[in-house]
């Protein structure tokens, strides 16, 4: 009894605590969805839509301000797609790769720059969309569908030859690879963003003034790198599906 009283007294102290995986659910029929992910995802989409409208509403021959920023982002994405897919194949895939990159980039930075936890919900808490495994898995599955479509549309039924080349013995490994690609994409992005937010949250709880600032700056850099890695791998997978394992090398630029 004395031990229990000591433990209860210890638990009464206002110690900092950090919860992970506390979700706010919406009920749609028999389906439960993560409401906070929808809210923050639409917030990120709204930022991208507003930025696009602002950049193109009064386009100037000499870009400046938001137009200059968006044109720089477009050139960066176009170069990224060209490097991964080659001069002949990259243009149709710029919108897809660009959408992936911009959504992940803004989502990651929203988790680092916006104090989501200050917004109170009936239950659960807001966080970056990429801080939820469902978002990263959905992005990875979209990438998988994209490279299946790219390979089948470019090579037809010949696309399925990749499963038995150079020898049918490798068929199980080739099939397994189709599952490991989206898994690696989704868990890499989710793990890095979750770890970054947890480290910053713990440091803010322990030392709430200046120590977390360098970690937050590093988190911004890491968030940008994760968006770049995801988009780069998506482009590489699409190119591999179109050209095959023994396809031509990327054109030099």
Swiss-Prot record:
Keyword terms: ATP synthesis, CF(0), Hydrogen ion transport, Ion transport, Membrane, Thylakoid, Transmembrane, Transmembrane helix, Transport
Name of the protein in its database record: ATP synthase subunit a
Subcellular location: Cellular thylakoid membrane
GO molecular function: proton-transporting ATP synthase activity, rotational mechanism
Gene: atpB
Native organism: Nostoc punctiforme (strain ATCC 29133 / PCC 73102)
Keyword Ligase assigned: no
GO cellular component annotations of the record: plasma membrane-derived thylakoid membrane; proton-transporting ATP synthase complex
Subunit structure: F-type ATPases have 2 components, CF(1) - the catalytic core - and CF(0) - the membrane proton channel. CF(1) has five subunits: alpha(3), beta(3), gamma(1), delta(1), epsilon(1). CF(0) has four main subunits: a, b, b' and c.
